[in-house]
Every structure is written in C-alpha cells, then in structure tokens.
C-alpha cells in the first residue's frame, strides 16, 4: 500500500470539491480518479476548475475534455459522473477507494454511507457531521481506527481552533473560553437580500454587511478534544471578504502565564509536532497574506492581548478554503496507513 497511490473520488464539485482536486493533482502520493456532480457538464467543470477568482488560474498541467465522461489533466484521465443518488455512483468501477463527500448535502453517517454501495471503501465528509466521528489532523487523527468507514474532517473553523486550543490546554489548562470567527463569505450566502427562512440575517446581502451567525465550531472542539467538552462555545461574523478567516479565542487559564510564555509555547509547537498544521507569525499581516496558505491555523503573535496572567485573547488566521482542503487529503493519507 505504501508505494501505491491512494485513489480518490470527489462527490460535489463546489468550492471545496474543486480545491481538494487541485490539492490531489499537485501531490504524488494520491490520485484523482473520478468526480461526480449532477448539476454541471464536463465543459463547465473544466472552466470552473481552471479559473478561480481567489486561487488563480490552474497552471500545473493542461486540462481538457476528452469526452462527456472523461477529463484529461495532462495525460491523466479522470472519470466524470453526473448522478444524483450517491448509491448509484459506480466508484468501484472508477477505482476510487476513498470518496470525498463535498456536496454539503450528505453530511450524516447514513446518507454518506450510500457511497459504500457503489464500491467506495471509505468516505470523508468535508463538513461537520452530527453523527460521523470527526477528526482534526494534528489533534486527534491518531484515534482513527481502520474499521471506521465514514468520517468527518470537521469544519474549517474547528481545524483552525482545535490545534491552538490543544496547545493552550496542554501547556496551561483552559478553564473556559469563547471564540469568535471573523469569517469570509461562503456559497450559502446571498449576493443581495434574499429569502433565508432558517437564518433571517443570513439572507442579507453578503458583500454589504457584517452578519452575525451561529457556528458549531467551538463546541465541536469538545468532540475532538474531550477534555475541553463544555468549556468552549462561540459565534461567527460573516464579513465581505471572499476567502481567509480569523479566529479570536478568549480564554481563562488554569495556570498563570505571561503573554510571552504563551507565544513561546505556540512557537515551539509550530516548529515541533504541529509543524505544517499550526503556524506562528510576528509579522504585520492582514487577511490576504494567507490566501493559499495550506496550514490549518496561523497564530498572530502581535494581534493577541493579555488582560492578566490568567485571561488572554489569542488570534489565529486560516485560509478557510485551501488550508481545509489540504487537511481533507492529509486525513485520507493518514487513514490509508491505519
């Protein structure tokens, strides 16, 4: 298994689906074999993949349509399906062992399990799930057991918050904390005021408002780090930027620590066990500096502040699209070795 490429299929070619495809196609240890999306043609799929307003044009190899069921990335053929019902997608025939479920629709265990009927061996849901086990790379992926066929990669915000919370809790202990994420626009929002029965504020124009919103990201940290269960909660502000978000974690510490000691601990971890997952910067950065950053969480040492040795506000950036999509692939690689 070690030298063989891991074969992956993607269901749903939206923001995350397309970026997961970009991540896969730039790596040597994984291979994209199939994409399913019932709502777009292969021609349109090519266009959407090739041109990206945030991450720029695809420049790694030529992409063309071979026929209505096949895309060519350079010489590499990728099978295209347009099937609505997940259990009818012939993943097995396409050779896909892992399926990335990125439609945003089939996020619970039973719905995602439909992919197994078509021959997939494992499914990774690229969203939080109410009942599938959630894994955050760098935090709890070592708890994955090979008999788990359906897992969730949690949310982009949980992937940013959990590594930071883990370091702080391991080193200083968290009594309790509140998180705010200042979060870029996502596809569920509206370009102008429109109907949104479940979330009235969420129906207001995305490019013109700061919109308070709920997020389960902080509570989900309690699922991946049980020792923090019930100690964290949070909310979100949706703001008119297209990508990159930032977590503000305000915590009460068990063990008194100066802000410099906290910085030192985070810096150490960012160069050690969490290298590539948790970053550390003392530069005067702003959000666009993190477009295309593949780390889950980049701690901004200059932006945080301490009120006392037991009460601090910590700030950490994340490319909520690219960083998260990279983790989806990392989780698959980890699962394949289990």
Swiss-Prot record:
SUPFAM superfamilies: Glyceraldehyde-3-phosphate dehydrogenase-like, C-terminal domain, NAD(P)-binding Rossmann-fold domains. D-glyceraldehyde 3-phosphate binds at residues 155-157, 186, 215-216, 238. GO terms for biological process: glucose metabolic process; glycolytic process. The active site is at residue 156. Coiled coil: none annotated. Pathway: Carbohydrate degradation; glycolysis; pyruvate from D-glyceraldehyde 3-phosphate: step 1/5. It comes from the Eukaryota. The record marks 183 as: Activates thiol group during catalysis. The keyword NAD applies. It catalyses: D-glyceraldehyde 3-phosphate + phosphate + NAD(+) = (2R)-3-phospho-glyceroyl phosphate + NADH + H(+). Residues 56-75 are annotated as: External loop. NCBIfam families: GAPDH-I. This is Glyceraldehyde-3-phosphate dehydrogenase, cytosolic.
């Amino acid at each position: 298994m070690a030298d063989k490429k891991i074969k992956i299929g993607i269901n749903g070619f939206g923001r995350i689906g397309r970026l997961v495809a970009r991540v896969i196609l730039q790596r040597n240890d994984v291979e994209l074999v199939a994409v399913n999306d019932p709502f777009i043609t292969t021609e349109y799929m090519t266009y959407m993949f090739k041109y990206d307003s945030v991450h720029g044009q695809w420049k790694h190899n030529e992409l063309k349509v071979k026929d209505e069921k096949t895309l060519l990335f350079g010489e590499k053929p990728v099978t295209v399906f347009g099937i609505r019902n997940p259990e009818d997608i012939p993943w097995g025939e396409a050779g896909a062992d892992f399926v990335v479920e990125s439609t945003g629709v089939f996020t619970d265990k039973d719905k995602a399990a439909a992919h197994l009927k078509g021959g997939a061996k494992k499914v990774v849901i690229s969203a939080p799930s109410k009942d599938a086990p959630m894994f955050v790379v760098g935090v709890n992926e070592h708890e994955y057991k090979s008999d788990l066929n359906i897992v969730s990669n949690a949310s982009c915000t949980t992937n940013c918050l959990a590594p930071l919370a883990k370091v702080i809790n391991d080193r200083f202990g968290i009594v309790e904390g509140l998180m705010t994420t200042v979060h870029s626009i996502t596809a569920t929002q509206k370009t102008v005021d429109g109907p949104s029965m479940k979330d009235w504020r969420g129906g207001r124009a995305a490019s013109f408002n700061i919109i308070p919103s709920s997020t389960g990201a902080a509570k989900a940290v309690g699922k991946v780090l049980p020792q923090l269960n019930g100690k964290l909660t949070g909310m979100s502000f949706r703001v008119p930027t297209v990508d990159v978000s930032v977590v503000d974690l305000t915590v009460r510490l068990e063990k008194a620590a100066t802000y410099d000691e906290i910085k030192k601990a985070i810096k150490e971890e960012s160069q050690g066990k969490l290298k590539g997952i948790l970053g550390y910067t003392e530069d005067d950065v702003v959000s666009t500096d993190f477009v295309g950053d593949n780390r889950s969480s980049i701690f901004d040492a200059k932006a945080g502040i301490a009120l006392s040795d037991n009460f601090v506000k910590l700030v950490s950036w994340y490319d909520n699209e690219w960083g998260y999509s990279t983790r989806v692939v990392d989780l698959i690689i980890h699962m394949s070795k289990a």
